[in-house]
Amino acid sequence: MALLRRCLAVPSQLFLVLVVCVGPMGAALAQGVARAPAFAWRPRSSLQGSLVLLAVRPAVADSVIGIQGELAGEPLHFEPVGDEFRALGAVPLEARDSVVARIVIEGAGGASDTVIAPLNVRRRRAPRERLHAAPEFVQPPESLAERIRTERELVGEIKRRAHDTPRLWREPFVRPRAAAVTGSFGVVRIFNGVVRSRHLGVDFAGKRGAPVRATNRGVVAFVGDLYYSGTSVFIDHGAGLVTGYLHLSSTLVAPGDTVACGQLIGRVGASGRVTGPHLHWLADYGNLSVDPLDLITVDLNAPLTFGPGPEAKSRAGRQPD
């Protein structure tokens, strides 16, 4: 664990942006009697399919009674960190050029201000990988269509419910295996000569029976067999985050179990659509797939340096009834 902790890295670049401040605070800004909230994106520009950190420092922190937001259609779960509020979010794999976060700051007395902040998005390389799999996993028979649809809906519901779970983790995330990465996130997979999908996770080498560990504290949301994913474990870490451990040979946890960071949860296998034994590790923020290796470097409590943002454009907002 000590070695894993030494591997944690926090990006040093920080991007400050404030585009629009709307509402009573904005009106005060226009009259020169209040300062704008300061915002920080980490990283300053993001790859498609990445996890990002958004921090906001309100003009008057002790007057804030609530803060809500959304990015790419997924809610943001802000938490106070000193006089700031911070939240993780996700950039869709199909995003182009930029994404926009919308944040509502609720103040005392019922007043609220809305801030809109864009984040630059960079294209993720998508190399192609040719693989051979059993024909039934490339073009499943019609008789399995209902099963595949039901399983897709089940996994989607697990991801959605993670937004209803409070954040359960406090330690840094760790890798599920101390092994080489053999498959990268975002690769285009060509099975039996047919383009089937993007690779929405990271593969780790491992012989059948090798240990697989939980990458952080959470509640086991699913244990079972899925057509494409084989024997799988999904862990709800709360605040929108879910991790999955696929193609296992066996599992050591049950739905509803609370697992600790680094706890043994299963063993490497070759179940589902695979070309050989390995672990497929995935991470999702709500319904958005992100590179799970981004979890290793995320730190909600990392010290950030705020500076003055650009001048805000303001207009009068909704007044309390």
Task: Give residue ranges: language-model regions.
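N-terminal secretory signal peptides that target proteins for export/translocation
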Residues: 1-9
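Short polybasic linear motifs
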Residues: 3, 14, 319
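Acidic, Ala/Val/Gly-enriched low-complexity intrinsically disordered segments
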Residues: 9-10, 316
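Bacterial N-terminal signal peptides
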Residues: 11-24
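Sec/Tat signal peptide C-region and signal peptidase I cleavage site
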Residues: 26-30
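Non-catalytic extracellular/periplasmic "stalk"
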Residues: 32-185
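Catalytic cores of peptidoglycan-degrading enzymes
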Residues: 174-317, 321
